[in-house]
Curated annotation (Swiss-Prot):
Entry function: Reversibly transfers an adenylyl group from ATP to 4'-phosphopantetheine, yielding dephospho-CoA (dPCoA) and pyrophosphate.
GO molecular function: ATP binding; pantetheine-phosphate adenylyltransferase activity
HAMAP family reported for this sequence: PPAT_bact
Organism, as annotated: Carboxydothermus hydrogenoformans (strain ATCC BAA-161 / DSM 6008 / Z-2901)
Identification of the protein by name: Phosphopantetheine adenylyltransferase
Feature type site, description Transition state stabilizer: H17
Gene behind the chain: coaD
Quaternary data: Homohexamer.
Keywords, comma-separated and alphabetical: ATP-binding, Coenzyme A biosynthesis, Cytoplasm, Magnesium, Nucleotide-binding, Nucleotidyltransferase, Transferase
Length: 162
């Protein structure tokens, strides 16, 4: 069985993430979308809220599992018997950091592969940070995030959208 892990903070999941997830799910028997708990980041949404948004957004994909983990991604892959890390790229500027992380992961666990997927051009400008800022100021989120996530952002900031 070909198993891949798509790790991220998903604070919140965007349509850019969803694009990568949908395409990766077609390439693997099982795709684990895993929230990486990063003590260096202060997320807007709690871990449970982010898991809920992922579960709701991805509930119709039979080969996708939702999970969370702490520690090194490569250790999580070993625990899940996964062979591949999926990483999404919005622009060439994302590549340098992602490439260095892929090399580090390969050094730690030589059999781990990293596959980079370019997001569709229509999503290349979307980031979780930008989405949170748009939501905070009551801007229109249509086309940026799944509907359920838009609802949760509106609740969090108590702002109306478009």
């Amino acid at each position: 069985m070909r198993i891949a892990v798509y790790p991220g903070s998903f604070d919140p999941i965007t349509n850019g993430h969803l694009d990568i997830i949908e395409r990766a799910a077609e390439l693997f028997d099982r795709l684990i979308v895993a929230i990486a708990k990063n003590p260096m980041k202060k997320p807007l949404f709690t871990l449970e809220e982010r898991l809920d948004m992922l579960r709701e957004t991805l509930k119709y994909y039979p080969n996708i599992e939702i999970d969370s983990f702490e520690g090194l991604t490569v250790n999580y892959l070993k625990a899940k018997n996964a062979q591949v890390i999926i990483r999404g790229l919005r622009a060439i500027s994302d590549f340098e950091n992602e490439f260095m992380m892929a090399l580090t992961n390969k050094k730690l666990v030589p059999w781990v592969e990293t596959i980079f997927l370019m997001t569709k051009a229509e999503y290349s400008f979307i980031s979780s940070s930008a989405v949170k800022e748009v939501a905070m100021y009551g801007g229109c989120l249509k086309g940026l995030v799944p509907e359920y996530v838009e609802l949760k952002l509106r609740e969090k900031f108590q702002k109306e959208g478009c």
